[in-house]
């Protein structure tokens, strides 16, 4: 399963982020081209004939700079803690230890590891236990100023070979994170193959 887009509810509008990056790209493009042309004029004073290839101007065009800035923002820049607070998007990327409690079928406890791979545009949530593994299909993050961040996602679960008592199924999970983003509590519901439900507590092991 590959990473997929996710929705941010009550965070900074994503289209505004694109516009802000476009404004910065336009400004940097203007400065870059101005400096390049100034350098050419300066070289002429020393009777040095030079020219800048069209390919260079294409790289320092607003479009070229925008692509570079957006790639940097998507992979790394958005994870800055101060910028993250402004964007209202938490950095959940990393490995999390899972303590689960099935509340149906007689009830039982289980453990697993949740791995979240996250960029500004996409996310992948993978849960691995001794009996099965699941991957997110859709996801959304909700920001509530009075409560904090919530993560909601749908997933598809696949039992490991030899687990005959388990069947493939889809489900839904929801987590509410502490203010320090080091732990969260939540619950899950399964259906279309396995009608079970329960609770989960996750604790961050490490950042990616």
Swiss-Prot record:
| GO MF entries | nucleotide binding
| Impact after mutating residue 155 to F | Beta barrel has decreased ability to bind c-di-UMP, no change in protection against phage in E.coli
* Record localization: Cell inner membrane
Q: Which residues cross the membrane?
A: 20-40, 52-72
- Name the reported effect of residue 120 to A: Complete loss of protection against all phage tested in E.coli, beta barrel no longer oligomerizes, dimerizes in presence of c-di-UMP or c-di-UAMP; when associatd with 78-W--C-88 del
The identity of this protein, by name, is CD-NTase-associated protein 15
Q: What is the effect of changing residue 200 to I?
A: Beta barrel has decreased ability to bind c-di-UMP, decreased protein stability
Recorded name of the encoding gene: cap15
Q: How does it assemble?
A: The beta barrel domain oligomerizes; in the presence of c-di-UMP or c-di-UAMP higher-level oligomers are detected.
Role of this protein:
Effector protein of a CBASS antivirus system. CBASS (cyclic oligonucleotide-based antiphage signaling system) provides immunity against bacteriophages. The CD-NTase protein (CdnE) synthesizes cyclic nucleotides in response to infection; these serve as specific second messenger signals. The signals activate a diverse range of effectors, leading to bacterial cell death and thus abortive phage infection.
**Reported effect of changing residue 153 to F?**
Beta barrel has decreased ability to bind c-di-UMP, no change in protection against phage in E.coli
> How does the entry describe the domains?
Cell toxicity relies on the transmembrane domain; its replacement by a SUMO domain prevents cell death in cells also expressing DncV from V.cholerae. The C-terminus (residues 78-208) forms a minimal, eight-stranded beta barrel. Trp-96 stacks against Arg-204 and forms a hydrogen bond with Leu-92 to close the barrel. A set of conserved residues in the 'top' of the barrel (Thr-129; Tyr-153; Tyr-155; Asn-157; Tyr-188 and Met-200) surround a probable cyclic dinucleotide-binding site; when mutated these residues decrease or abolish nucleotide binding and impact protection against phage in vivo.
Q: Name one GO biological process term.
A: defense response to virus
Q: Which UniProt keywords apply?
A: Antiviral defense, Cell inner membrane, Cell membrane, Membrane, Nucleotide-binding, Transmembrane, Transmembrane helix
């Amino acid at each position: 399963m590959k990473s997929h887009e996710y929705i941010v509810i009550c965070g900074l509008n994503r289209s505004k982020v694109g516009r802000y990056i476009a404004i910065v790209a336009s400004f940097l493009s203007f400065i870059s081209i101005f400096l390049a042309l100034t350098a050419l004029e300066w070289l002429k004073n020393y009777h040095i004939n030079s020219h800048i290839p069209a390919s260079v101007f294409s790289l320092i065009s607003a479009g070229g700079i925008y692509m570079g800035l957006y790639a940097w923002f998507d992979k790394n820049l958005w994870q800055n803690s101060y910028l993250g607070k402004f964007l209202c998007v938490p950095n959940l990327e990393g490995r999390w230890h899972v303590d689960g409690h099935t509340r149906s079928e007689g009830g039982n406890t289980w453990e697993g590891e949740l791995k979240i791979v996250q960029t500004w545009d996409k996310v992948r949530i993978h849960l691995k236990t001794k009996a099965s593994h699941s991957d997110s299909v859709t996801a959304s993050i909700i920001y509530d100023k009075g409560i904090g961040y919530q993560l909601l996602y749908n997933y598809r679960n696949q039992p490991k070979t030899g687990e005959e008592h388990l069947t493939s199924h889809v489900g839904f999970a929801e987590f509410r994170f502490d203010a320090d983003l080091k732990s969260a509590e939540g619950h899950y519901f399964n259906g279309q193959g396995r009608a079970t439900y329960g609770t989960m507590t996750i604790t961050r092991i490490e950042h990616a």
